Amino acid sequence: MTIAIGKSSKEPKDLFDSMDDWLRRDRFVFVGWSGLLLFPTAYFALGGWFTGTTFVTSWYTHGLASSYLEGCNFLTAAVSTPANSLAHSLLLLWGPEAQGDFTRWCQLGGLWTFVALHGSFALIGFMLRQFELARSVQLRPYNAVAFSGPIAVFVSVFLIYPLGQSGWFFAPSFGVAAIFRFILFFQGFHNWTLNPFHMMGVAGVLGAALLCAIHGATVENTLFEDGDGANTFRAFNPTQSEETYSMVTANRFWSQIFGVAFSNKRWLHFFMLFVPVTGLWMSAIGVVGLALNLRAYDFVSQEIRAAEDPEFETFYTKNILLNEGIRAWMAAQDQPHENLVFPEEVLPRGNAL
């Protein structure tokens, strides 16, 4: 037998291969190429939000207190949007507005654009992380497809909607009570609850919650009792080859309850993916429509009849009056720079008054 001794046929690794090996190495927390986008942007987005809610006032942009330092709590603190006068400026720290002054940048609302843009890229990086990991372990990329729903909603609400309006001012501020206020704004100015895309979104999200509850309960109800552990978590090996629960039994049960049931796991789980993701995408499309000031359903005949007949009123006409009240009160409070003053005779009144 002849043994050939010589140089290895492998070529030396270039910089890209070395980085690829290090980034995709098997470790406790996967980094990957997507991590180069995800980790820095998520760090800056969260850091900006914690900084803003802790220290930064909204007095100069909204006339509000919005930080822990001013007495807010977790539910009322927020990173507020820039003033309406700043329109769609990126509000870069080194830009003409702040001119490198960090304090002035915070006062102008620069942290909001900072958090919004870094947060958007962090969400995209997280979706790419799911793609990358799925490819590495030879899975299909449906996790990433599912995560596109929340990304679509975030981008449409925080970026596309204010881009269609006069400025970032009309986007939601990053805070719990601030987003509640934004929801009221959406109802008053866009009649959002009567928008068909909102209806599809509600059906998707609540339908998904119902599907999750039914699915979880059904699996628990049809577990095979062949484990000897003290509870569900100890009774089965995560790498077992056999089924954990009986699809046949579940099918028979729901066939008797509803008259119809899913016949296989693939269709069942695809449906559980399809319902919430489609609902979120429909909501996102609806918000893009609102950015262009597209209207929801208008039942003008009911409005005309209610105006002519004091005894005629529907839940729709009552809601329209409520929306007018939201606009009349919120516009003056929310946009003090417009100096809006409404005479009492134009403020909405119910037909009984």
Swiss-Prot record:
Primary location group: plastid
Catalytic activity: 2 a plastoquinone + 4 hnu + 2 H2O = 2 a plastoquinol + O2
Positions with a binding annotation for chlorophyll a ChlzD2: H118
Residues annotated as binding chlorophyll a PD2: H198
Transmembrane segments: 41-61, 125-141, 153-166, 208-228, 279-295
Topology of this chain in the membrane: Multi-pass membrane protein
Keyword set, alphabetical order: Acetylation, Chlorophyll, Chloroplast, Chromophore, Electron transport, Iron, Magnesium, Membrane, Metal-binding, Oxidoreductase, Phosphoprotein, Photosynthesis, Photosystem II, Plastid, Thylakoid, Transmembrane, Transmembrane helix, Transport
Pfam family, one: Photo_RC
EC number: 1.10.3.9
A single MF term (Gene Ontology): chlorophyll binding
Residues recorded as bearing N-acetylthreonine in the entry: T2
Cofactor binding note from Swiss-Prot or TrEMBL: The D1/D2 heterodimer binds P680, chlorophylls that are the primary electron donor of PSII, and subsequent electron acceptors. It shares a non-heme iron and each subunit binds pheophytin, quinone, additional chlorophylls, carotenoids and lipids. There is also a Cl(-1) ion associated with D1 and D2, which is required for oxygen evolution. The PSII complex binds additional chlorophylls, carotenoids and specific lipids.
List of residues binding pheophytin a: Q130, N143
One GO-annotated biological process of the protein: photosynthetic electron transport in photosystem II
InterPro entries: D1/D2, Photo_II_D1/D2_sf, Photo_RC_L/M, Photo_RC_L/M_CS, PSII_PsbD/D2
CC annotations in GO: chloroplast thylakoid membrane; photosystem II
Modified residues (Phosphothreonine): T2
Source organism superkingdom: Eukaryota
Role according to the record: Photosystem II (PSII) is a light-driven water:plastoquinone oxidoreductase that uses light energy to abstract electrons from H(2)O, generating O(2) and a proton gradient subsequently used for ATP formation. It consists of a core antenna complex that captures photons, and an electron transfer chain that converts photonic excitation into a charge separation. The D1/D2 (PsbA/PsbD) reaction center heterodimer binds P680, the primary electron donor of PSII as well as several subsequent electron acceptors. D2 is needed for assembly of a stable PSII complex.
Record family assignment: Belongs to the reaction center PufL/M/PsbA/D family.
Note: 2 of the reaction center chlorophylls (ChlD1 and ChlD2) are entirely coordinated by water.
Assembly mode: PSII is composed of 1 copy each of membrane proteins PsbA, PsbB, PsbC, PsbD, PsbE, PsbF, PsbH, PsbI, PsbJ, PsbK, PsbL, PsbM, PsbT, PsbX, PsbY, PsbZ, Psb30/Ycf12, at least 3 peripheral proteins of the oxygen-evolving complex and a large number of cofactors. It forms dimeric complexes.
Protein name per UniProt: Photosystem II D2 protein
